[in-house]
């Protein structure tokens, strides 16, 4: 035919002389093999008219060049892409995929196929953007697609790429290809209104990673986009030596920001909101952030600028119409709840419609993490959840003492699809002590009314660790209203009885996860658990640590009946050998039998029987000392904590995968073992040695050859060390604890540690009596991101006070005892306001004049436990001061649990 032309398609990636395939006609059934053929040349016959109509390249070629009079035309391009383009030209059919759309767009632009470009735009707008967070593979092709769209002048596709990257920024920021994202695309995503991240911390980290090789001005411009008020304080403190952050001149967010500041970054695509450690978050900020976010309402993307700026920051005592509307919709108490700190803005009448059609919704939000957010009040959080994110599936308010277990009663109506709820608190320390005076309770705040309780049909995992106020009647109600629970943590719920726990277990026979450490778990609970096992027991995790009410016989019955355990903790219980010998399980991966009566023979038998065992703890098991059969066991452990009998295991063992090694009393490690430790355990990350006979040279040799070591803990060595081994510490170290090890440690040596270990997060020094007040300055300047600090019997460290430590904003645990009587009486109050994340504070009355002032009802803020030790002076002929030596008398312990405050007097120094 006259209008036909033979096209010779040459693959630009093939060498000359490659194999060819001939196609006599372009029939549809021949096209699929043609696409799949990996040939260097393809000859085919096509219509000259159709090519000219649908491609400006061919139209020009057939009009103005010699090919206009030739029946043979050579076209060189990537053969697979060109075949797809010709399919679109001749058959108006395209095969578009994430991996090929960039090449297709580039080819379509070159060949002038506007229809194909339009189809690419449609596919990107519909298929690619619709898969947003579901198709992770698409992300790796976005940078090239953006580059091609920018170079070929297709701004709609370039903007679509920026939007897609913004929506999936969380996945891109954690991927390996972050550095391959073009800077302009990265900037466009960061500035996009639909930027979706779970935490500002993740955005900050991604910017720091991406801008390592960019100019300073560029990095600062991007860092300015981070909403620093929602970056956890401890993370910001860790970045204090970052020159970029210092140049940005940002103050640490210790208090809630002004309401006019930028709110939380929310979008309609937000699935996870992680505010853990952002103690400055309040319930008002949660509401305000939703109102000011670009969220889809009634089919349109709008920025909620309907807020009345003139009345937005009104000091009126009455709540705005929006709040009144919410309270009228969801009354939580008989009297309507009002915000006390700040008032929400007034909003337009459209938002206040009874049908709530104008209220922004976070329909995609599934996980809400509010750990350590002690300023968020339960009543207002309930309103926020019910109004904006009723599809929530996971809620974490751990380390938030203001939340009690009965917040669950409101969650049932606020988010009926909740699956995981975490209300964990710190475990009480009282179980470790002998109580001299009984607990006295005091109501801190008026709790909200419990009200009616709908059934949680989907709740499968519940964490109530540390809820000492939880009663049997309340646990029984939880059991009735949460019938689907398969995982629960009741550790530290000391107010529960054995019968109360047993009743709960009877109602949940399909538990797979049970933590009941430090409870009254006893014979009745064992019987209930075994009754459930008669059906079909799937219990995989069981923690009964410190459950002293369990008899040896009850433990034997338990272990002989349940075979599904993967993790088992029975430390400091009445476990005996029969429990391990008669155990029917063979799938244990984690076993903790510390402080029990088992012998080495039983431990050896258990190791042989459970070949998947990766974590073993048998410290303080004195019966393991004399059994040499342990030396024959082959171990594939990741974590080993041991004392008596461990010498037999470590005699000739190589543990190439061991990451954690804790050796205590009875371990009897030798100098040879310590020197060979790096070759035996090359992956070691955590090393703890207690009550061992150590030498500086041996420690120095071992530490220097452990490149992955992050934790070093030395306690009560049999002879004092000079501290020479400290020269081998590296920048990888995160935790350093020297307790009664280096009495001669000086400020100069501490400064040397500060130089080599800049990333410390935990520091504990005990009996370092040569330190003075200069040590506090070294600590505060060297490690601003410390989360745990303990100084006990450290010379005169606090003789001049401890005000210099008040810049350690990330502290969560602080112990200062017998370091010099320079602490002011109001130190506890100062600490509660200066350390926004502080949970545990331990002091000694010897370090102040008189007694410490304790917080009033409303001043506890984030603190959950205060321990104040008291001493008495015993006359001594060797003491020249006349007062005698100090001897511990008792410890006053104040624990905040929910809305109550408990006070104990115990014998031990806790």
What are these regions (language model features)?
Residues 1-48, 87-99, 151:
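N-terminal BTB/POZ boundary and linker segment
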């Amino acid at each position: 035919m006259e209008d036909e032309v033979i096209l010779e398609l040459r693959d630009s990636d093939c060498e000359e002389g490659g194999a060819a395939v001939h196609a006599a006609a372009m029939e549809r059934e021949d096209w699929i093999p043609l696409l799949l053929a990996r040939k260097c040349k393809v000859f085919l016959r096509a219509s000259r008219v159709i090519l000219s109509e649908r491609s400006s390249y061919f139209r020009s070629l057939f009009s103005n060049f010699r090919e206009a009079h030739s029946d043979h035309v050579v076209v060189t391009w990537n053969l697979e892409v060109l075949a797809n383009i010709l399919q679109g030209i001749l058959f108006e059919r395209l095969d578009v995929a994430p991996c090929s759309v960039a090449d297709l767009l580039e080819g379509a632009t070159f060949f002038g196929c506007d229809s194909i470009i339009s189809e690419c735009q449609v596919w990107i707008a519909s298929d690619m953007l619709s898969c947003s967070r579901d198709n992770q593979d698409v992300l790796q092709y976005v940078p090239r697609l953006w580059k091609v769209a920018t170079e070929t002048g297709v701004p709609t596709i370039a903007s679509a790429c920026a939007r897609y990257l913004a929506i999936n920024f969380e996945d891109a920021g954690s991927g390996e290809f972050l550095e391959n994202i073009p800077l302009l695309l990265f900037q466009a995503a960061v500035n996009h209104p639909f930027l979706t991240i779970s935490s500002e911390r993740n955005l900050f980290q991604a910017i720091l990673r991406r801008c390592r090789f960019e100019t300073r001005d560029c990095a600062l411009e991007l860092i300015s986009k981070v909403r620093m008020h929602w970056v956890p304080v401890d993370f910001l403190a860790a970045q204090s030596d970052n020159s970029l952050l210092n140049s940005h001149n940002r103050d640490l967010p210790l208090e809630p920001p002004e309401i006019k500041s930028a709110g939380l970054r929310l979008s309609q695509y937000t699935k996870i909101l992680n505010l853990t450690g952002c103690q400055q978050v309040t319930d008002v900020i949660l509401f305000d952030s939703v109102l000011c976010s670009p969220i889809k309402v009634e089919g349109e993307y709008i920025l909620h600028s309907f807020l009345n700026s003139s009345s937005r920051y009104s000091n009126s005592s009455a709540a705005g119409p929006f709040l009144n509307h919410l309270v009228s919709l969801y009354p939580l108490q008989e009297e309507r709840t009002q915000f006390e700190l700040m008032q929400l803005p007034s909003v337009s009448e459209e938002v206040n419609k009874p049908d709530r059609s104008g209220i922004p919704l976070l329909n995609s939000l599934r996980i809400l993490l509010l750990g350590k957010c002690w300023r968020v009040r339960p009543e207002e959080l309930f309103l926020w959840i019910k109004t904006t994110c009723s599809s929530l599936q996971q809620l974490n308010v751990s380390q938030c003492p203001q939340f009690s277990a009965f917040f669950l009663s409101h969650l049932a109506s606020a988010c009926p699809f909740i699956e995981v709820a975490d209300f964990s608190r710190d475990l009480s320390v009282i179980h470790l002590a002998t109580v001299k005076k009984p607990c006295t309770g005091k109501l801190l705040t008026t709790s909200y009314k419990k009200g009616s309780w709908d059934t949680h049909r989907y709740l499968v995992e519940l964490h109530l660790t540390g809820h000492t106020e939880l009663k049997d009647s309340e646990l029984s109600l939880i059991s009735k209203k949460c019938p689907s629970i398969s995982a629960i943590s009741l550790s530290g719920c000391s107010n529960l009885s054995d019968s109360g726990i047993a009743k709960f277990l009877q109602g949940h026979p399909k538990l797979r996860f049970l933590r009941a450490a430090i409870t009254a778990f006893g014979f009745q609970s064992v019987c209930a658990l075994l009754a459930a096992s008669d059906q079909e027991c799937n219990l995989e995790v069981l923690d009964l640590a410190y459950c002293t009410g369990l008899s040896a016989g009850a433990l034997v019955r338990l272990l002989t009946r349940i075979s599904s355990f993967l993790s088992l903790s029975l430390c400091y219980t009445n476990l005996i050998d029969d429990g391990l010998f008669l155990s029917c399980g063979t799938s244990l991966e984690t076993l903790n039998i510390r402080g029990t009566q088992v012998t080495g023979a039983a431990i050896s038998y258990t190791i042989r029987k459970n070949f998947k065992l990766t974590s073993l703890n048998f410290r303080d098991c004195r019966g393991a000392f004399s059994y040499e059969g342990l030396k024959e066991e082959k171990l594939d452990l990741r974590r080993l904590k041991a004392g008596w009998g461990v010498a037999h295991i470590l005699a000739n063992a190589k543990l190439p995968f061991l990451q954690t090694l804790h050796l205590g009393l009875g371990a009897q490690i030798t100098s040879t073992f310590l020197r060979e430790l790096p070759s035996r355990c090359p992956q070691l990350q955590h090393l703890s040695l207690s009550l061992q006979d150590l030498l500086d040279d041996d420690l120095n040799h071992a530490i220097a050859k452990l490149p992955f070591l992050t934790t070093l803990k030395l306690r009560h060595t049999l002879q004092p060390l000079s501290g020479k081994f400290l020269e081998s510490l590296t920048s990888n170290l995160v935790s350093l604890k020297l307790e009664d090890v280096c009495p001669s440690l000086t400020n100069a040596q501490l400064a040397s540690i500060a130089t080599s270990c800049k990333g410390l997060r935990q520091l504990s020094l005990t009996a370092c009596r040569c330190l003075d007040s200069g040590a506090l300055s070294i600590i505060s300047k060297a490690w601003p991101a410390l989360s745990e600090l303990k100084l006990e019997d450290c010379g005169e460290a606090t003789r001049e006070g401890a005000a210099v430590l008040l810049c350690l904003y990330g502290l969560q645990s602080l112990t200062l005892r017998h370091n010099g009587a320079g602490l002011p009486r109001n130190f506890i109050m100062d600490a509660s306001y200066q350390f926004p994340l502080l949970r545990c504070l331990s002091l000694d009355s010897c370090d102040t004049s008189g007694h410490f002032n304790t917080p009033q009802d409303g001043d506890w803020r984030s603190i959950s436990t205060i321990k104040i030790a008291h001493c008495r002076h015993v006359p001594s002929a060797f003491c020249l001061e006349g007062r005698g030596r100090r001897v511990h008398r008792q410890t006053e312990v104040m624990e905040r649990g929910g809305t109550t405050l408990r006070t104990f007097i115990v014998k031990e120094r806790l």
